[in-house]
Amino acid sequence: MAYPAKLSRAAIIQAAIKMVEEDAAEPPSLRAIARRLHVATNALYNYFPDRSELNAAIAVAGSRRMLSSLKRAVGNAEGRDELDRFSKAFLRFTRTHPQLYDFLNENHPTGQEAAALFQEWAEIMNRAWSPFYLPERMPKVIFTHAALLHGMTTLERLWQWRNARGHFDFANQMLLDALVSSKHAKRGPKKTGATVEIPLPWAP
């Protein structure tokens, strides 16, 4: 049986992400995606046998989209500037794509593709923090940084915190200042070009 020429795994995922961003009341079903793509629902089962596999694919694609956005924002920055750019880009993405960010927090994919993606997250965060901390401290430092970013996202969106963006700038500066100047931090940080594999707290 020939499948419609417009149907592909990438097209299905792209449609699903668009639906998540339009209405995140619940994850898009295969039937709803089929209607969006004007194909029979059965045709989608050739790519995704069930919703769990579909949700995992959406999460991987969405997380990669977020990571790409952060990488572009960070660019070739180094040191403290790199940390500032990462924080601001993270918040900018969560503000621009709130439904997708919620979906990523509710769906944690496993498998080789997800593991490779999580390693990319580890690399960008390790690159930002490695000038300041030794590997054994890195997981706790990264967790602290991530907790601030996620917490500010929650306060701004769910509590509708007044002047949240200004408060975030202050909190971000205070936390980064504290971490960079901590007694546990390295003294006289230098870039070595080496990347140490750091397991992230949320990695599969």
Predicted regions span which residues?
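N-terminal intrinsically disordered/low-complexity leader segments
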Residues: 1-7, 18, 183-204
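Amphipathic alpha-helical packing segments from all-alpha helical-bundle domains
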Residues: 108-144, 166-177
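Generic hydrophobic, amphipathic alpha-helix propensity
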Residues: 8-16, 33, 58-66, 70, ...
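Helix-turn-helix
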Residues: 11, 15, 19-53, 57
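Amphipathic C-terminal alpha-helical segment
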Residues: 96, 146-164, 177-189
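Hydrophobic alpha-helical connector segments
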Residues: 57, 71-99, 109, 118, ...
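Alpha-helical DNA-contacting segments of helix-turn-helix folds
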Residues: 20, 54-62, 104, 108, ...
